[in-house]
């Protein structure tokens, strides 16, 4: 991701295009809970977000103080048009409607590159720091994050690098995830060894059966 300055405007080149954002935008809409978590940690207020399936630790955003802008999969375009946001932050779930969102306000695509998970997360955090003039807070945030990762990796190493298997259960479907996947940080960042080195890399994981688990 490339960030350039034009006066008080940041020009951010991302995977889907270009976002021209005024520094410290006031009306911010977030469609990614990872980005919301980061903004919350940096003390950046947001105007709106999807209020379905909000993680428990971000439950305060269920408050009426925040506008409901639809769901992660189905943005409420009418509400967004009404809000006239200064910045819309999205990730992979909204990729297909990027063009429509970008007509309603500068839209920044902050997806994670699972093949380089940790570095990708840090880059996204630093971009948010640039937008909201929170560079110092970002340095502290990332230092704390790196310390926590190092502490977990030390425990993993001390345990003899144990194996792990990450699965997702959705109705009757069970999917396994390996390195370089959406849950690949368990292996690539925290240092666990995948119990099955042949798990195929897929956005939705590799379909498995109960027999596979046995």
Where are the model-predicted features located?
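Solvent-exposed, acidic/flexible segments
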Residues: 29-32, 73, 91-94, 114-121, ...
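Solvent-exposed coil/turn segments that connect beta secondary-structure elements
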Residues: 15-17, 33-34, 44, 51-52, ...
């Amino acid at each position: 991701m490339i960030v350039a300055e034009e006066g008080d405007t940041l020009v951010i080149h991302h995977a889907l295009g270009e976002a021209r954002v005024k520094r410290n935008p006031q009306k911010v809409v977030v469609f990614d809970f990872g980005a919301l978590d980061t903004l919350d940690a940096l003390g950046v207020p947001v105007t709106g977000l999807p209020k379905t399936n909000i993680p428990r630790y971000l439950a305060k955003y269920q408050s009426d103080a925040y506008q409901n802008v639809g769901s992660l999969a189905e943005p409420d375009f009418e509400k967004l048009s009404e809000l006239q946001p200064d910045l819309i932050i999205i990730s992979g779930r909204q990729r297909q409607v990027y063009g429509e969102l970008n007509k309603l306000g500068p839209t920044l695509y902050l997806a994670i590159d699972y093949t380089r998970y940790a570095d990708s997360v840090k880059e996204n955090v630093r971009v948010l720091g640039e937008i909201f003039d929170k560079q110092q807070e970002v340095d502290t945030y990332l230092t704390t994050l790196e310390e926590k990762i190092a502490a977990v990796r030390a425990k993993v190493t001390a345990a003899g690098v144990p194996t792990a298997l990450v699965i997702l259960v959705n109705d009757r479907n069970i999917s396994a995830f390996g390195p370089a996947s959406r849950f690949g940080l368990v292996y690539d960042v925290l240092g666990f060894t995948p119990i099955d080195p042949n798990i195929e890399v897929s956005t939705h994981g590799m379909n498995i059966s109960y027999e596979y688990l046995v």
